[in-house]
Design a protein with these regions (language model features):
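Active-site-proximal, Lys/Arg-enriched surface segment
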Residues: 3-5, 16, 37-41, 94-207, ...
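Short, amphipathic alpha-helical "recognition" segments used to contact nucleic acids or chromatin
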Residues: 53-64
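Short, conserved catalytic/metal-binding motifs centered on acidic residues
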Residues: 56, 71-73, 124-138, 165, ...
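Domain-level cores of phosphate- or acyl-group-handling catalytic modules
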Residues: 208-278, 286-380
């Protein structure tokens, strides 16, 4: 029989409990909403108070209403005895002067304060985690929407990429910051880059040719002058000088011919690259949209001093710069953490330099890096080598680790004049070699892997928030509304975490009791993080596939997780008895 039941983190709270909405309203009271939302009361001069509107937007999802219209035309109408209006709520949601980033930071700080009173996590690893995920949209008129490449599925989607900065407090992942990005289109950008390089080469070749041609004309003028002088008086010295000058002119003429051919070749290459760009603009246009589609997109004139204007600028900012900005903001806001974790997509010299600047605060880096062409200076040989060359150089230093069924090689290197350690890791027999970099020089392999696994909690957040909290489902054309709805979804996520901690987890001594049979039935994702590693490793061994990639796929895909759960259900039934 096919299992159709959703096994996400918060399924029972949203659908099964008829009193959840009222209970969560009580939970919301602990967050001191009046203080957080009250600072924006001046935005509205009359009508419904800002605090009431934002509070309503926060709790309406828990009354089984998936959008503002359904809530205010049904639920609100039943309560008030008349039809409610959705307009003030949409207007406030799209207001550029609301600092959604400040609201999210204040809400997260309040959650950590409340959570710390219920359970103590001192001594556990705290981390800042960065990861991105696609948010698919259906309307091409949405402001700043673009075609983007989903590196997980390999498909091109219409929408945004959301880059999330999350905080791991020792037991839970909470989102504290984010930015929305659009993609210009890598194929077109590459073609334009090649065209621009060809254009520079063509201009340089033409400049060199013209400069030499001017020199050649001067050389010929000297030769003609000597010829005229010989016609007047035939001196031996003049004849010798004329012969030398004639050779100079001959060499100059040959060089001019070579430079002319080089210039023509550069111009031909430039024409070819320009033709490629023209074809790409038709096949893969800017942002994946035609010029007419881009013109029809929603546009809004914003106050340049408003938070909404700054958020809109972030859509075209590089993710590397966004990561740096979020990292700096988190430190300034008083978040304390030991490590910064992210995948190979975000690692760069600039990010490493910024993290190194926080060494006095004890902040260190653990990140996956690509086995590409980046050069590292070996500490022993002082030679510059790429990752693959380094791994082969130290293959005799390979060590076996039973806990993770892994082989690894630890290599001390310099990267961008900064001392770091490279760990080359191979899990099982089906995985490929991967490289993990850290500037924590005292970190051992076991702690490295345990800490890096925390990064997958961000994948859990994406899955649960998209499935249950409507993350990224807003289809408003206004970019400010997109930011607002995402912020509300993240706040709802923290509300549910606190609600679960207060009503379900504290009596058992933990927020989430992942080892119980209830967790097996209702919390497949978290259960995977804690107990499935050996099973995933076994599957990887049998199928000869990459264990880490399989693990991430199981987190993202409910159906695959359920199928694997059914296959191994006899094992789970025997395990408690053992």
């Amino acid at each position: 029989m096919k299992i159709t039941e959703n096994l996400g983190e918060f399924q029972k709270f949203i659908e099964d409990d008829s009193k959840t909405g009222l209970c969560l309203e009580d939970t919301l009271g602990f967050f001191d909403i009046q203080r957080i939302f009250g600072q924006f009361e001046s935005i509205k001069q009359s009508g419904i108070r800002v605090t009431l509107i934002l509070t309503t937007l926060l709790v309406m999802l828990f009354y089984r209403n998936r959008n503002i219209h359904s809530y205010f035309s049904r639920q609100h109408g039943k309560q008030m005895g008349r039809e409610g209006s959705k307009n003030p709520y949409y207007d406030l949601l799209g207001n550029e002067h609301i600092s959604w980033r400040s609201i999210l930071y204040l809400f997260a700080k309040r959650y950590l304060n409340l959570s710390g009173r219920i359970a103590e996590y001192s001594g556990r690893i705290r981390a800042l985690i960065f990861d991105d995920s696609p948010l698919e949209k259906s309307g091409k008129k949405i402001e700043a929407v673009s075609k983007m490449h989903d590196h997980v599925t390999g498909r091109f989607l219409l929408g945004f990429k959301i880059l999330v900065c999350g905080y791991w407090d020792g037991n839970n992942f909470i989102p504290i910051d984010f930015s929305l990005h659009r993609e210009r289109g890598s194929e077109l950008d590459k073609a334009r880059g090649k065209r621009n390089r060809a254009r520079r080469k063509a201009r340089l070749a033409e400049a060199v040719y013209r400069e030499h041609r001017a020199q050649h004309l001067e050389t010929r003028a000297v030769l003609n002058s000597l010829r005229d002088e010989m016609n007047v008086c035939s001196k031996k010295a003049t004849a010798l000088e004329y012969a030398k000058q004639e050779k100079r002119v001959s060499r100059s003429k040959k060089k001019q011919s070579r430079l002319r051919n080089r210039m023509k070749l550069a111009q031909a290459i430039l024409e070819e690259k320009e033709e490629v760009v023209r074809r790409k603009e038709k096949k893969a246009p800017l942002y994946g949209l035609t010029p007419s589609q881009r013109r029809r997109q929603y546009r809004k004139n914003r106050d340049k001093t408003s938070p909404g204007y700054q958020r809109r600028l972030e859509a075209d900012m590089s993710k590397t710069q966004s990561v740096i900005n979020m990292l700096v903001r988190a430190v300034k806001r008083g978040f304390e953490f030991d490590y910064v974790l992210f995948d190979s997509w975000f690692f760069s010299k600039e990010i490493l330099a910024r993290i190194e600047s926080f060494r006095t605060k004890g902040i260190k880096l653990i990140a996956m890096v690509k086995m590409g062409k980046n050069l590292y200076r070996d500490c022993l040989s002082s030679k510059d080598m790429d990752a693959n060359t380094l791994r082969k150089q130290y293959r005799n230093k390979e060590t076996r680790n039973r806990k993770f069924n892994a082989r690894y090689i630890k290599v001390p290197v310099w990267y961008d004049n900064r001392r770091v350690n490279l760990f080359f890791v191979k899990l099982g027999s089906g995985s490929k070699w991967k490289a993990i970099i850290t500037n924590d020089l005292e970190l051992g392999f076991n702690k490295l892997m345990e800490t890096y696994h925390i990064r997958w909690s961000c994948e859990v957040f994406f899955k649960d928030a998209k499935q249950h909290l409507q993350l990224g489902k807003c289809q408003c054309n206004n970019f400010d509304s997109q930011i607002g709805t995402i912020t509300l979804a993240m706040m709802q996520y923290m509300m549910l975490l606190l609600y679960k901690q207060m009503h379900y987890g504290h009596s058992l001594g933990r927020i989430f009791d992942l080892i119980s049979s209830q967790a097996e039935e209702e919390n497949i994702t978290r259960y995977l993080l804690e107990l499935f590693w050996e099973i995933v490793n076994g599957i990887g061994e049998i199928l000869k596939v990459d264990c880490m990639e399989l693990f991430e796929e199981m987190i993202r895909d409910n159906q695959r997780a359920e199928e694997i759960m059914r296959l191994f259900s006899p094992v789970f039934e025997k395990k408690p008895a053992a």
